[in-house]
Amino acid sequence: MHLATMLLFLPLIHSPIAAAYLGGFDYNATHFIRGLNDGGFLNSLFWWVTFTGSITFMVLITIALYLAGARKEALVLALVFIITNAVAFGLKYAIARPRPSDLGIPPEAQPAFPSGHTANAFAFATTLSSYHRKFSIVMFSLALLVAFSRSYLGFHYVTDLIGGALVGITISIIVTQAAKSVDGEVTLIANTSPPPTTWQGVVKLPLVFITQLLRVAYALIKRRK
């Protein structure tokens, strides 16, 4: 599925016809999941789970992978996250679906569709699984838990989660396939700078990362021409 096709498809979820078919299911499924939350231990646990779909966590995990030596994966992941969040936020404000305010979310909060946390979680799972298939079950299980947590905590309707998953998976597939088509060049870029051995090297590391990220992005754009 091409990105343009996905962007055209997602708003259809909120068309009048789709609303007639999905409205009851969406409301009932969301309230059922929310009703499972009794405010106890699981509520606290799912707050931690939902954090793993946040932009903050994704930045931290990307940095950790880069420092651990998985530079190629970290650079591709960074591109995936940037595009995923740009598309997710664009769709949020284009569709402007209200949050489920009856579940305790203030009406002035950021629009609901699609779920950005879910998009990030599935983008992460799809990207890492494409490079390390043995972790696929674990990665997608975690992504599903993040998605579930968003309705469990009352932040999203179920269709927001479906939309977020589609955004994350689709963009990840597009970017990772493009990166693998120029894998040699991406690998070379990722290895242009040796790991820092001094404080000066550590200080320069963010600039090195940004430079490499821009070079990888250019390599993918050049490949598309």
Predicted regions and their residues:
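Membrane-embedded catalytic cores of phosphoryl/pyrophosphoryl-handling enzymes
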Residues: 101-222
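Hydrophobic, aromatic-rich transmembrane alpha-helices
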Residues: 58-69, 123-126, 137
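Membrane-helix interface segments
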Residues: 41, 70-74, 132-138
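Interfacial segments of alpha-helical transmembrane regions
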Residues: 62-86
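Alpha-helical transmembrane spans of integral membrane proteins, capturing the lipid-embedded, hydrophobic core
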Residues: 3, 77, 81-89, 165, ...
